[in-house]
Amino acid sequence: MTFHEEDLDQAEEVHVRSLTAAEADGDERAVEAALRPRTLDEVVGQVRVRDQLGLVLEAARRRGRAPDHVLLSGPPGLGKTTLAMIIASEMGAPLRLTSGPAITHAGDLAAILSGMNEGDVLFVDEIHRMSRPAEEMLYMAMEDFRVDVVIGKGPGATAIPLEIPPFTLVGATTRAGLLPGPLRDRFGFTAHLEFYEPDELDLIVQRSARLLDVHVLPDGTAEIASRSRGTPRIANRLLRRVRDFAQVRADGVVTLPVAQDALDLYEVDQLGLDRLDRGVLDVLCRRFGGGPVGISTLAVAVGEERETVEEVAEPFLVRNGFLARTPRGRVATPAAWEHLGLTAPPTLTLPESDPPLFED
């Protein structure tokens, strides 16, 4: 893949502006960063991924070379960005962060790559949303550590190779199936992050409570963990909201009743369903008789973007048996009807298997 020399300055400006905006994202992001594990040993859960990744990094250290490129996939909030930061930290390398939507032209990517030093780690979040020209340039950069710079225009144009020091690309995606095969095949290590178990989330909440200096009793952390949808990011967010409730409406100690009252106030029920989840199920059951309904129609009916329903609500609802994906659309399960206090149609049938959540 090639790009024109005159695109470089403009692309450099675009990248710097996007990167600065991402870093200055308010107090919420700063608190989340403070709660992130710093090493693989501090990571709770994801045992298989943690062990495999640790082996890859240790082998690279012993060889004195940059690790293979890494692709991390899975639902939002499970720790893909955290693992990218840990990879850089474990290798003692600088981390450069950007995102797929910010790389709209091949020149954007070339500007980033031209500033890389040997051993640097480049993290591209939402890598499946990169532009096609940038993807094609990335093929050569990942495999041969070079890109072609085009000098001039028309018949007299000349392509000059630009050498790039060996680096490690860490790509993160919630939709691995949208990545072209040639790009996916260039990652030496791929891992899919799974939802966390309640006991793992309990440990995460306990750790975060210590870092935030929140007094939480064991039954309080367990309650927060059980309503966190298997997602550490949500667990930490709920902990902060429960902390606020405890400080304002209680004596500052997060007990089981305090946690329950706080989470009920924020409309997170005992199974972890929030307003969006219940809205999806309610529309599906009441308006469409349980389905099947196409995802786009369902998103319009609940007043959300398709991506929000598909990537935030749907994985949790499918995993917990409230929603089924069929070739004809989404179908509410008997558990969904029961959770809403409704009676399921007597003819309700479900498919034996569903297509993968994140592969198409």
Curated annotation (Swiss-Prot):
Q: Name one GO biological process term.
A: DNA repair
In terms of Pfam families, this protein maps to: AAA_lid_4 (PF17864), RuvB_C (PF05491), RuvB_N (PF05496)
Q: Which GO terms describe its molecular function?
A: ATP binding; ATP hydrolysis activity; four-way junction DNA binding; four-way junction helicase activity
Compartment list: Cytoplasm
Region: Large ATPase domain (RuvB-L), residue numbers:
4-196
Please name the InterPro entries in this protein's record.
Answer: AAA+_ATPase, AAA_lid_4, DNA_helicase_Holl-junc_RuvB, P-loop_NTPase, RuvB-like_N, RuvB_C, WH-like_DNA-bd_sf, WH_DNA-bd_sf
Q: Which reaction does it catalyse?
A: ATP + H2O = ADP + phosphate + H(+)
Major subcellular site? cytoplasm
Q: Region Small ATPAse domain (RuvB-S): which residues?
A: 197-267
Q: Which residues bind DNA?
A: 306, 325, 330
Binding of Mg(2+) occurs at 81
Q: Which GO terms describe its cellular component?
A: cytoplasm; Holliday junction resolvase complex
SMART domains with a match to the protein in the record: AAA
Q: Which PANTHER family match?
A: HOLLIDAY JUNCTION BRANCH MIGRATION COMPLEX SUBUNIT RUVB (PTHR42848:SF1), PTHR42848
What job does the chain carry out? The RuvA-RuvB-RuvC complex processes Holliday junction (HJ) DNA during genetic recombination and DNA repair, while the RuvA-RuvB complex plays an important role in the rescue of blocked DNA replication forks via replication fork reversal (RFR). RuvA specifically binds to HJ cruciform DNA, conferring on it an open structure. The RuvB hexamer acts as an ATP-dependent pump, pulling dsDNA into and through the RuvAB complex. RuvB forms 2 homohexamers on either side of HJ DNA bound by 1 or 2 RuvA tetramers; 4 subunits per hexamer contact DNA at a time.
The entry sums up its family as follows: Belongs to the RuvB family.
**Quaternary organization:** Homohexamer. Forms an RuvA(8)-RuvB(12)-Holliday junction (HJ) complex. HJ DNA is sandwiched between 2 RuvA tetramers; dsDNA enters through RuvA and exits via RuvB. An RuvB hexamer assembles on each DNA strand where it exits the tetramer. Each RuvB hexamer is contacted by two RuvA subunits (via domain III) on 2 adjacent RuvB subunits; this complex drives branch migration. In the full resolvosome a probable DNA-RuvA(4)-RuvB(12)-RuvC(2) complex forms which resolves the HJ.
Q: What is known of its domains?
A: Has 3 domains, the large (RuvB-L) and small ATPase (RuvB-S) domains and the C-terminal head (RuvB-H) domain. The head domain binds DNA, while the ATPase domains jointly bind ATP, ADP or are empty depending on the state of the subunit in the translocation cycle. During a single DNA translocation step the structure of each domain remains the same, but their relative positions change.
Q: Which HAMAP family match?
A: DNA_HJ_migration_RuvB
- Recorded protein name is Holliday junction branch migration complex subunit RuvB
Species of origin reads Nocardioides sp. (strain ATCC BAA-499 / JS614)
